[in-house]
UniProtKB/Swiss-Prot annotation:
Residues 290-541 form the Glutamine amidotransferase type-1 domain. The keyword Transcription regulation does not apply. The lineage of its organism: Bacteria, Pseudomonadati, Pseudomonadota, Gammaproteobacteria, Pseudomonadales. Residues 1-265 are annotated as: Amidoligase domain. One of its GO terms (cellular component) is cytosol. The keyword Metal-binding applies. Belongs to the CTP synthase family. UTP binds at residues 13, 186-191, 222. This is CTP synthase. It catalyses: UTP + L-glutamine + ATP + H2O = CTP + L-glutamate + ADP + phosphate + 2 H(+); L-glutamine + H2O = L-glutamate + NH4(+); UTP + NH4(+) + ATP = CTP + ADP + phosphate + 2 H(+).
Length: 543
């Protein structure tokens, strides 16, 4: 039977519930347990797919093609379980399902209410998402006291009663601020946060106290006294220099022992040797490179969360400190390529819309002409094709129909038909809804032997995740190839371009898929590892 750990947050948002939850999950997995994780988002959007990156941050794409919260990226980086569409749902998704049932008449004329209909649907989805795992950690987004969170908190209150105290526990993250002028940490915000929880029938079993200073024994004892939580279950979690230290921090305070004892689970001790190796490689690099990341959402770096982490992982696997120089593509449009001088490699990530595209194209041209290693992802591949068409082939009006529908050389256009991961045919038009209509999820890609990308993967066939609705225009592809553009990867059916490379260049690879979604700190990712190796070679050549 599955045991549930419900995770809530109080006092302020952005305390790191996702990372703390994933770290505990990593320890439990290291003890031999089958672990999964869920994220419940209280916002009304059906999913984050159409939300602005400036508001929501990254949209993480699962293997089965769900557009989900970025916390699922943390989950997959910390545990081996692959997330699916069942591991993340929103208020909007819940209401959409309940209202569809009401329209069908499934409720037989009953008055639809938050309790029981909405809460029952939330509980059903939690149980479904947990599957057959030994332990499921269920993170509720937002902060206790938010009006949007109330149905979710009520649902987990009910579920705790239904499954019993031996199968459910509540872990609450709070802020314990350090007052420098007083030289002490303050526990009152935590006390009030727990009071808020208890007022709706939820008693925490574990408190994770977030602070920029260690929470001393006397403060933890005081918190335990006023919150009715066991003293050993009051955990101090201060800021660390790498998030991959957190499993060891929680383990050292006995959190996993407390959970295992509480649930009556029989399992081995935690083997955290893999995480020790990750931390050692992260904190003790032997080399250093600087890579320019040219994007359009630089005001909120969470928009590139998985990509930034993937670059860190590549640094770990290469024992190299990767310094990312974040450059807004609009700044290149205004200030020129001087912003790129001195870097060891250039990375252009995905994005949507016309703003900043010309700056990305300029960055591609700089990388190609100056033989600087280049990695383009999604839009980063499309702008590489546009740049090649303009500056190598002389098609000065070359563009994507996303940006210019009147272009005389639309080298990138809307995909109107493709096969999804199950083999079903998907059809789209310009009039299709934006939400959930892209080519999403894991797809096969066939790599050309002898190419740079094949050298990285050392495989003929790979599977990577996608999120796009535009592709290289097959009608103009023969002319692009004839002019020297190397097509080194195609979709499983051969219909779509997946990877392009520049010839006579030390390392220039651009892919339509998103490899960052499958990179992990313990395993890295072959494409990013190859990219950092190329950057390191460039750095050593300059030296």
């Amino acid at each position: 039977m599955t045991r549930y750990i419900f995770v809530t947050g109080g006092v302020v948002s952005s305390l790191g519930k996702g990372i703390a939850s994933a770290s505990l999950a990593a320890i439990l997995e290291a003890r031999g347990l089958k672990v999964t994780m869920l994220k419940l988002d209280p916002y009304i959007n059906v999913d984050p797919g159409t939300m602005s990156p400036f508001q929501h941050g990254e949209v993480f794409v699962t293997h089965d093609g769900a557009e989900t919260d970025l916390d699922l990226g943390h989950y997959e980086r910390f545990i081996r379980t692959t997330m699916t569409q069942n591991n993340n749902f929103t208020t909007g998704r819940v209401y959409e399902h309940v209202l569809r049932k009401e329209r069908r008449g499934d409720y037989l004329g009953a008055t639809i209410q938050v309790i029981p209909h909405i809460t029952d649907e939330i509980k059903r989805r939690i149980i479904k998402g947990a599957g057959d795992a030994d332990v499921a950690l269920v993170e509720i987004g937002g902060t206790v006291g938010d009006i949007e969170s109330q149905p979710f908190l009520e649902a987990i209150r009910q579920l705790r009663v239904e499954v019993g105290s031996k199968r459910a526990m509540l872990m609450h993250l709070t802020l314990v601020p350090y007052i420098a002028t007083a030289g002490e940490t303050k526990t009152k915000p935590t006390q009030h946060s727990v009071k808020e929880l208890r007022s709706i029938g939820l008693q925490p079993d574990v408190l994770i106290c977030r602070s920029d200073h260690p929470v001393d024994v006397s403060s933890r004892r005081k918190i335990a006294l006023f919150t009715n939580v066991e003293e050993r279950a009051v955990i101090s979690l201060e800021d660390v220099d790498t998030i991959y230290k957190i499993p060891a921090v929680l383990h050292a305070q006995g959190l996993d022992d407390f959970v295992v004892e509480r649930f009556g689970l029989q399992c081995n001790g935690a083997d955290l040797s893999e995480w020790e190796k990750v931390v050692d490689a992260k904190l003790n690099p032997e080399h250093e490179v600087t890579i320019a990341m040219v994007g359009k959402y630089m005001e909120l770096l969470d928009a590139y969360k998985s990509l930034i982490e993937a670059m860190s992982h590549a640094g770990i696997t290469n024992r190299t400190k990767v310094n990312l120089r974040y450059i807004d593509s609009e700044d290149i449009e205004n200030q020129g390529t001087a912003l790129l001088e001195g870097v060891d490699a250039i990375l252009v990530p995905g994005g949507f819309g016309l703003r900043g595209v010309e700056g990305k194209i300029t960055a591609v041209q700089y990388a190609r002409e100056n033989k600087v290693p280049y990695l383009g992802i999604c839009l980063g591949m499309q702008v590489a094709v546009i740049e090649f068409a303009r500056n190598v082939m002389g098609w000065k009006d070359a563009n994507s129909t996303e940006f210019d529908r009147t272009s005389g050389h639309p080298v990138v256009g809307l995909i109107t038909e493709w096969e999804d991961a199950t083999g079903a045919v998907e059809v789209r038009t310009e009039a299709s809804d934006l939400g959930g209509t892209m080519r999403l999820g894991a797809q096969e890609c066939l790599l050309e032997a002898g190419s740079k990308v094949h050298d990285c993967y050392a495989k003929d066939v790979i599977i990577e995740r996608h999120r796009h609705r535009y592709e290289v225009n097959n009608k103009l592809l023969p002319q692009l190839i004839e002019a020297g553009l190397k097509i080194s990867g195609r979709s499983g059916d051969g219909a779509l371009v997946e990877v392009v490379e520049a010839q006579d260049h030390p390392w220039f690879v651009a892919c339509q898929f998103h490899p960052e979604f499958t990179s992990t700190p313990r395993d890295g990712h072959p494409l990013f590892s190859g990219f950092v190796k190329a950057a390191l070679a460039q750095h050593q050549k300059k030296a």
